[in-house]
Design a protein with these regions (language model features):
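Conserved C-terminal alpha-helix-loop-beta "cap" of PLP-dependent enzymes
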Residues: 130, 136-221
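Conserved PLP-enzyme active-site core in the AAT-like
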Residues: 1-148
Length: 221
């Protein structure tokens, strides 16, 4: 099978429909790792989700952007996959004493997204776009956006992701990450050599965005 991340940690998406079409034409199944793509199933003007693109199975980490408890995820299966067989394999590789706390949180989050998912993630995308514009206006930072899309290596971009390039202010991403945590009490997702990633969720408010933007402006000084 072919395994595709959709999207990557930074929000980059491949041409998933083309990958699925090519793989299926050769009798190969496609599995999508959508650990950071739960919202793609509910958002408008977002990259295509795995199952809509024709993937055969997709693992979605509801706890990352869907609101369920940590460790809880859902495995989606398409028509070409025998769900009973998948269930048998899962039963062989995991505990038979499932956590009903985690299962309950999945069901509660599923219901919440079914009822309010579109409006919730539209608000997330709006907050991310606001943050992107504000951060880029500071100078020295670059918050990635749809301007990266080139139709090939970067086919689409997940606008709910707030990935920011920091090297031009003279600090590595991990340094900015540490400063935000230690000096401003702001815990973001991660920092690497060049970037930071702030994960905006359905639980965030515009005040949280303002705090982050203000802290980044202060750090740049």
């Amino acid at each position: 099978a072919v395994l595709v991340n959709n999207p990557t940690y930074y929000g980059i998406c491949s041409d998933l429909r083309a990958i699925v079409k090519l793989a299926h034409s050769r009798g190969i199944k496609v599995l999508t790792d959508e650990a950071h793509g739960t919202h793609l199933y509910f958002g408008e003007n977002l990259p295509v989700c795995g199952m809509a693109a024709g993937a055969d199975m997709s693992a979605i980490s509801m706890h990352k952007s869907g609101g369920s408890l940590t460790q809880s995820s859902i495995l989606l299966t398409g028509k070409a996959v025998k769900a009973d067989h998948v269930r048998q394999i899962i039963n062989l590789t995991q505990t038979t004493s499932a956590s009903y706390l985690l299962l309950s949180s999945l069901d509660i989050s599923r219901r919440n997204l079914a009822l309010r998912g579109r409006e919730s993630f539209a608000r997330v995308a709006k907050m991310a776009e606001y943050a992107r514009n504000e951060i880029n206006s500071i100078g020295g930072y670059y918050a990635y956006g749809r301007d990266l899309v080139n139709g090939t290596s970067i086919y689409d971009y997940d606008v709910t992701k707030l990935s920011v390039y920091t090297l031009d202010i003279g600090l590595a991403g991990i340094e900015v990450y540490d400063l935000l945590r230690d000096e401003y009490d702001i815990q973001i997702e991660f920092g690497d050599i060049c970037n930071i990633l702030a994960y905006i969720s359905i639980g965030d408010r515009i005040q949280d965005i303002e705090r982050l933007v203000g802290a980044l402006q202060d750090i740049k000084r």
